[in-house]
Every structure is written in structure tokens, then in C-alpha cells.
Amino acid sequence: KGLDPSVWVAEDSILALPDIRNIYTKDIAPNLETDMPVIVTGDFNSCSHLDWTERAKPLHHGYGPVAFPASRYMLENGFKDSFREKNPDEVAYQGGTVAAIYGQMQMSRIDFIYYKGGLKVLSSKIVRTAPEIDYVWASDHAAVLTVFEVE
């Protein structure tokens, strides 16, 4: 049951999606009334449908495509995923961020930088720990680093 993508999507719909909808309504939407760029970052506790594609099935133990609702919600509201914009090949650039210090699930991205309006992505990468400091890293997540140019 835990390896059933329909369960993942259902859980995402119950847990991650309501959180992002609430944040969107209270904190993001009011800032969209101007022409200023908006950047939304963080641990979404949800994977991306842009990563779990038909092409990437072999990387995800044969599962995919998976339509994770939280990532779809952001794109449906006009935001772009900065990492996937700059690294569109989800097979060559998996960009895993979760459990980074343990070497597990490194193909799963749950940390994102979404943006819209007046920005151009110059670069975007995942920053992992150096092997010699694996157990000193402040988080079990890798960092997402995106450099933008304001247009």
C-alpha cells in the first residue's frame, strides 16, 4: 500500500496541498497584485510531478508518472520551478534534496524555489554536503540554490 502512487497522491492532497493553498491564499496571493517578482521557497514535503515522469520511471523503481498535487498547484497558478527550468532533463538532473546526509532518496526533490514575474534563472543547483562533514550538516535536506536576474 505504501508503494502505491495513488496513495501518495491522496496523501499529498490531504497534507501538502491544503498547506500550500493556505499559504498561497494568506501570504502569496496578496503579493501578486503588484508587478514585483515573487519567489516562494521551502520544504513542501511533497515530490514534483516534473520529476516523476514516464521517462524517469526507472529512477523511481518503476513508478511514474505521478501527478503530485502540490507541485501542479504551483504551476497552475503561474509559478515556475527554478531548478527544473534550468535543468529540464529530469533523468540527467534528478536534484534530490531529501535525506541528503544519509544517501537515501537522493532522486526525490521536496525542497523548491518557485518564482513568477520579472525574473530570469541564471543558474540553479542542489548543494549537498561534503563527505567529510556529512554528520555535521545542519539539516537532513540538501539546499536548492538559484541565481536570478531581475528583468
Name each region found by the language model.
Residues K1-E151:
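Active-site regions of metal-assisted phosphoester/phosphodiester hydrolases
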